């Protein structure tokens, strides 16, 4: 039995209503949604596991809520006593219950956001300040540009036609929720939204409520834990599921809304179907940086699978078009083409469900589309055979080999309809289809290849040594450039089959041979991670030529570390000064900047400022050489890795650094948050498009010289402080490993790549994602804020007038404001008291003073941050976010304690607790606790501990809405 009677416990529903702020607005239904889902879940929990376990859940929640209200350490001690007395089976159920409740809270929030959005649009209210941190609507942006900023509608239209946002989906291991659960969450979200529809009947409501309970129970009964790590092919399939479920239909729907918004500002012309407004790329199966599981076979399979999926989607829609375009009037060009196709038709197509007999010439559009269908069928089947067997008996000329071939008959149909007075029909499903073909092509998404610069150096070093001309690795940068350019200007082959090859060298060359073998439209960019110099780019250009890549991929240097960002503009300027290279790029260059590793290298403050300056300098260099530069932003989901609200991130970039062309990564859990549902997909496309347009037509202010000088000065202080602790403090590596679940991260099986670039090594070799993940789990968020406090304190102590300047910067400079606001949000999610508990349980006694020093630094930074922003309390300007975070805190606290005590039991074999009798009715005394580890038979720990730990990690990640 629970230690306190049920009568003394407040229900979670009542606790929620007592805890959260008053109704934020008339559109606020969050608590109502949240309470409904929790009521249903608690009923299910009682049915499945009994009243005693439900009481224990409520008791844990109450103690957490009391702690969050008063921050009384005694409440943590009481909660710890409850949690440590649970037997392994009950621990798993409690962890799973709280993790599930946090997922339900997320779903309630998503439905609330969609509801508020609809209410806002109904009112025509585009100036809701409470939405400022999260919303950016395309129609709102058009009206702002034309009405407030006096841009002409034609200027807006022209800018939009030439704008491109390329969203690059990556398999970064930050999505901790299994696909099986994501699908169930989607159905829960749908049921909840429909339950609150105004026109719902009593019978509908009853059936929806039953469906809601069914899906909640199904999600709870599904194993949350991935029992094996996903392969790169698994990651690609998971990523492609978003295209199939939401993006495929979302793109034409969004572009139709753009047409409507244009019409509302006086443009009576549709956006051209081939305007590259939204593009999609992927790293899934192409990102080799530190991931040995991405092989040439993986890259080949991923490309072919994507092509097969694209052909299948086109094929599934072509018959709908054939039904729609039944008219007989057409222009002469189409009539002639249809007659030719009709005469050459030799057989009935009995493998089709519809239109399986020869289509008569009196239906010319159907004749044309029937031929398109035939080629799509053959394209799909040939790709399927290539994927399965490596060869196909279907001739290549019976299929579509490039997107121009595919578009031509569709364009012919479109022109004919327009010329015959049927433009409204042309602008229906056919226009949507044309836009899909233009956006997705035959490859569905273009695959980027990413590889470390050192791996290319290894290959070239092997070549030069084999040629007996020295060691490329030991050459100076000038010598490397001289040799590379000499070879690029010549024609001799550099190596043959006798080149000695290590496994790593073979991987680089085999990858390039796969690129040469597959259709060129499968690929996008070749990204060089850890790029430092011009030779890194020239090396890839030479290797592409040597491996016979007929249409070379554009080569994109990725500058990540602080020093590399500082020298990026000089490296690019040198490239632009090389005549061979200028001729190669044809006036266009792409440069990627990395937010994750720069933050791990120098801290968030200095990294953010250096990223800002690097972009300014790169754009300046590009303008001087007449090159159109596209910035590729490698942003993660967390603030520590460059994350934050999309449109604010874009609008705070330096002036002229976007210019209508933007690439950005969409990583891990951010993919689900951006594309998990149709309305989320629509909102994501709106935000990126609107913010990119606004940045180009109404650039943010440039920082004043005195602001720059102050930022330069304090960035040095921030970097010194950060590095003095993370890299120079001898106690830090040991403390970090003990005070966080850093070492246990890999057990979550949420990605195919290792958590370290090298098996040994300290913080330097640890990847940015587990680095951020570990500190996020303990709610201390050290990588985000460390260095801020020292920088601000230095400036204010030096001259109190600097505080006034900080206020000015916060109020007038979008970059500075966004930087401060995001860190303020992280502090609102933080809890140093919880971090202190991890220290108390897990850290050796000699390291405890170090932890206290860091927490003192945390409090000082928090206080200084509020001074800079001119705020009394955290998030005082964002009541919606404040409400959402407070709703989650009590769930997360329970999981934090359960995680900390579980880590204690895992790491300290001498730590013993007194367990009370089993309380869940699912496992009776006649069943041994050993059954609990049937799902995890290989665990090296006592029964239930590893699963409990992983469930707490997933739950905390869900509650904080990010992992790494």
From Swiss-Prot:
One of its GO terms (molecular function) is phosphoenolpyruvate carboxylase activity. Through the carboxylation of phosphoenolpyruvate (PEP) it forms oxaloacetate, a four-carbon dicarboxylic acid source for the tricarboxylic acid cycle. Keywords: Allosteric enzyme, Carbon dioxide fixation, Cytoplasm, Lyase, Magnesium, Phosphoprotein, Photosynthesis. It holds the Pfam family PEPcase. PANTHER family: PHOSPHOENOLPYRUVATE CARBOXYLASE (PTHR30523:SF35). Its EC number is 4.1.1.31. Tobacco, a typical C3 plant, shows characteristics of C4 photosynthesis in cells of stems and petioles that surround the xylem and phloem. Its cofactor is Mg(2+). This is Phosphoenolpyruvate carboxylase. Pathway: Photosynthesis; C4 acid pathway. Belongs to the PEPCase type 1 family. The keyword Lyase applies. Coiled coil: none annotated. It is found in: Cytoplasm. Homotetramer. GO terms for biological process: carbon fixation; leaf development; photosynthesis; tricarboxylic acid cycle. The active site is at 172, 600. The modification Phosphoserine is found at residue 11. The keyword Nucleotide-binding does not apply. It catalyses: oxaloacetate + phosphate = phosphoenolpyruvate + hydrogencarbonate. Its main location: cytoplasm. It is an enzyme of class 4 (lyase). GO terms for cellular component: cytosol. It comes from the Eukaryota.
């Amino acid at each position: 039995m629970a230690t306190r009677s049920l009568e003394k416990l407040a229900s979670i529903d009542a606790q929620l209503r007592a805890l959260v702020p008053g109704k934020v607005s008339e559109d606020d239904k969050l608590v109502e949604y949240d309470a409904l889902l929790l009521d249903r879940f608690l009923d299910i929990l009682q049915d499945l596991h009994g009243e005693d376990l439900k009481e224990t859940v409520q008791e844990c929640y109450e103690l957490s809520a009391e702690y969050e209200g008063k921050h009384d350490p005694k409440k943590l001690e009481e909660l710890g006593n409850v949690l440590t007395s649970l037997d392994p089976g009950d621990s798993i159920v409690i962890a799973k219950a709280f993790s599930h409740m946090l997922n339900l809270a997320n779903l309630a929030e998503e439905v609330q956001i969609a509801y508020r959005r609809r209410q806002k649009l109904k009112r025509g209210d585009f100036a809701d300040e409470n939405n400022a941190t999260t919303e950016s609507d395309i129609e709102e942006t058009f009206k702002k540009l034309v009405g407030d900023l006096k841009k002409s509608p034609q200027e807006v239209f022209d800018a939009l036609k030439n704008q491109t946002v390329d969203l690059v989906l990556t398999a970064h291991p930050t999505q901790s929720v299994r696909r099986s659960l994501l699908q169930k969450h989607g159905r829960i979200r749908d049921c909840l939204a429909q339950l609150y529809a105004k026109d719902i009947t009593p019978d509908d409501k009853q059936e929806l409520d039953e469906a809601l309970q069914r899906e909640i129970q199904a999600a709870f009964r599904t194993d949350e834990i991935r029992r094996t790590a996903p392969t790169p092919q698994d990651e690609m399939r998971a990523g492609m599921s978003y295209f199939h479920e939401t993006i495929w239909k979302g793109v034409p729907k969004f572009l139709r809304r753009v047409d409507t918004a244009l019409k509302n500002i006086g443009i009576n012309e549709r956006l051209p179907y081939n305007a590259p407004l939204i593009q999609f790329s992927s790293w899934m199966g192409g990102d080799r940086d530190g991931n040995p599981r991405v092989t040439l076979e993986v890259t080949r399979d991923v490309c072919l699978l994507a092509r097969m999926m694209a052909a299948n989607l086109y094929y599934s829609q072509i018959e709908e078009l054939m039904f729609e375009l039944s008219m007989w009037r057409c222009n002469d060009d189409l009539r002639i083409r249809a007659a030719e196709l009709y005469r050459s038709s030799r057989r009935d197509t009995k493998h089709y469900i519809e239109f399986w007999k020869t289509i008569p010439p009196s239906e010319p559009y159907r004749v044309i589309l029937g031929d398109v269908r035939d080629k799509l069928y053959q394209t799909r089947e040939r790709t399927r055979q290539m994927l399965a067997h490596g060869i196909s008996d279907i001739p290549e000329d019976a299929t579509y080999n490039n997107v121009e071939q595919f578009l031509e008959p569709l364009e012919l149909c479109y022109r004919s309809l327009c010329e015959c007075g049927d433009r409204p029909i042309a602008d229906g499903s056919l226009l949507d289809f044309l836009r899909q073909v233009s956006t997705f092509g035959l490859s569905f998404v273009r695959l980027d290849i990413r590889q470390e610069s050192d791996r290319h150096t290894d290959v070239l070093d092997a070549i030069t040594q084999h040629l007996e001309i020295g060691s490329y690795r030991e050459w100076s940068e000038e010598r490397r450039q001289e040799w590379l350019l000499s070879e690029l200007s010549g024609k001799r082959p550099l190596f043959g089959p006798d080149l000695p090859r290590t496994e790593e060298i073979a991987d680089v060359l085999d990858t390039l041979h796969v690129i040469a073998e597959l259709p060129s439209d499968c690929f996008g960019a070749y990204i060089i991670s850890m790029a430092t110099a011009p030779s890194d780019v020239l090396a890839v250009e030479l290797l592409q030529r040597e491996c016979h890549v007929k249409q070379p991929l554009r080569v994109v240097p990725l500058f990540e570390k602080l020093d590399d960002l500082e020298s990026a503009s000089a490296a690019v300027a040198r490239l632009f000064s090389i005549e061979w290279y200028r001729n190669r790029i044809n006036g266009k260059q792409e440069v990627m900047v990395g937010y994750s590793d720069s933050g791990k290298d120098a801290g968030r403050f200095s990294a953010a400022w250096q990223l800002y300056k690097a972009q300014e300098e790169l754009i300046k260099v590009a303008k001087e050489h007449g090159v159109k530069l596209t910035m590729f932003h490698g942003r993660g989901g967390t603030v520590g890795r460059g994350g934050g609200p999309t449109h604010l991130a874009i609008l705070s970039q330096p002036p002229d650094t976007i210019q209508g062309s933007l690439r950005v990564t969409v990583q891990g859990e951010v993919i689900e948050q951006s594309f998990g549902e149709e309305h989320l997909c629509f909102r994501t496309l709106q935000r990126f498009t609107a913010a990119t347009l606004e940045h180009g037509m109404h650039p943010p202010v440039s920082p004043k010289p005195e602001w720059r000088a102050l930022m330069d000065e304090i960035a040095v202080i921030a970097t010194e402080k950060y590095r003095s602790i993370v890299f120079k403090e001898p106690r830090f590596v040991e403390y970090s490993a003990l005070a966080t679940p850093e070492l246990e991260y890999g057990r979550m099986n949420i990605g195919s790549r290792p958590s370290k670039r090298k098996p040994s090594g300290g913080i330097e070799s640890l990847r940015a994602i587990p680095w951020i993940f570990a500190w996020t789990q303990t709610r201390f968020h050290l990588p985000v804020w460390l260095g801020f406090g020292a920088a601000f304190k230095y400036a204010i102590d030096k001259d109190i007038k600097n505080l006034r300047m900080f206020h000015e910067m916060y109020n007038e400079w979008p970059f500075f404001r966004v930087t401060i606001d995001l860190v303020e949000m992280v502090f609102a999610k933080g809890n140093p008291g919880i971090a202190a508990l991890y220290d108390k349980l897990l850290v050796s006694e000699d390291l405890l003073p170090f932890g206290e020093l860091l927490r003192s630094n945390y409090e000082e930074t928090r206080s200084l941050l509020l001074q800079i922003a001119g705020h009394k309390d955290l998030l005082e300007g964002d009541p919606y976010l404040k409400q959402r975070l407070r709703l989650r805190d009590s769930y997360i606290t329970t999981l934090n304690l359960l995680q900390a005590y579980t880590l204690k039991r895992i790491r300290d074999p001498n730590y013993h607790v007194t367990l009370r009798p089993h309380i869940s009715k699912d496992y009776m005394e006649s069943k041994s606790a050993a059954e609990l580890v049937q799902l995890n038979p290989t665990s090296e720990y006592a029964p239930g501990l590893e699963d409990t730990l992983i469930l707490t990690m997933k739950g905390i990640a869900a509650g904080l809405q990010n992992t790494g």
